[in-house]
UniProtKB/Swiss-Prot annotation:
One BP term from GO: rRNA 5'-end processing
SS bonds (residue pairs): none
UniProt keyword annotations, A-Z: Cytoplasm, Hydrolase, Nuclease, Ribosome biogenesis
UniProt keyword annotation of Signal present: no
SMART domains found in the cross-reference section: YqgFc (SM00732)
Annotated protein name in UniProt: Putative pre-16S rRNA nuclease
EC numbers, comma separated: 3.1.-.-
Entry keyword Transmembrane: no
Cellular location(s): Cytoplasm
Function statement: Could be a nuclease involved in processing of the 5'-end of pre-16S rRNA.
Class of enzymatic activity (EC top level): hydrolase
Any one GO molecular function term: nuclease activity
Any Gene Ontology CC annotation: cytosol
Length: 160
């Protein structure tokens, strides 16, 4: 099931279990995973996109190996909050993904996640070559950590 509101997505999940965060690009998919208690997001890998069926098979394997209970897709909104062609492409990917990987899917505003990831990698004095290799899954980590922080906040506020 696909949830537009992150609160609805979080409410659909079991109390524990790992989540994945995906940073969907035209050529790659950055993947990050959480721990089972959903406290920490860890960048995992970058999948080179080929055909959807092959991409989905790789994501299914990760979901099985990590025992995922849900997936968060970064939703690329424009700076004014509107959705453009990239956001529509992300929504289409989600619709296709739930057909082959029946897990709850939620969206998280990914504006500036790649900028934050790039800044963190620069501050860590990461080489240009290494930054290019890891930027997508580091950005996925930022996306997923945002969701985990929201979940924590909702829990403290009694909303989840």
């Amino acid at each position: 099931m696909i949830h537009d509101r992150i609160e609805d997505f979080l409410a659909s999940l079991p109390r524990t279990g790992a989540l994945a965060g995906l940073d969907l690009g035209t050529k790659t998919v950055g993947v990050a995973v959480s721990d089972g208690l959903r406290r920490i997001a860890t960048p995992l890998l970058t999948v080179r996109r080929t055909k959807f069926t092959e991409d989905a098979a790789k994501l299914k394997a990760i979901a099985a190996e990590r025992r995922l209970v849900g997936i968060v897709l970064g939703l690329p909104r424009n700076m004014d909050g509107s959705e453009g062609p990239r956001a529509q492409s992300t929504r289409a990917f989600a619709r296709n993904l739930v057909q082959v990987l029946p897990l709850p899917v939620g969206f998280w505003d990914e504006r500036l996640s790649t900028v934050a990831a790039e800044r963190a990698l620069l501050e860590a004095d990461t080489s240009r070559k290494r930054r290019a290799e890891v930027i997508d899954h580091v950005a996925a980590g930022y996306i997923l950590q945002g969701v985990l922080d929201r979940l924590d906040w909702l829990g403290r506020e009694g909303g989840a």
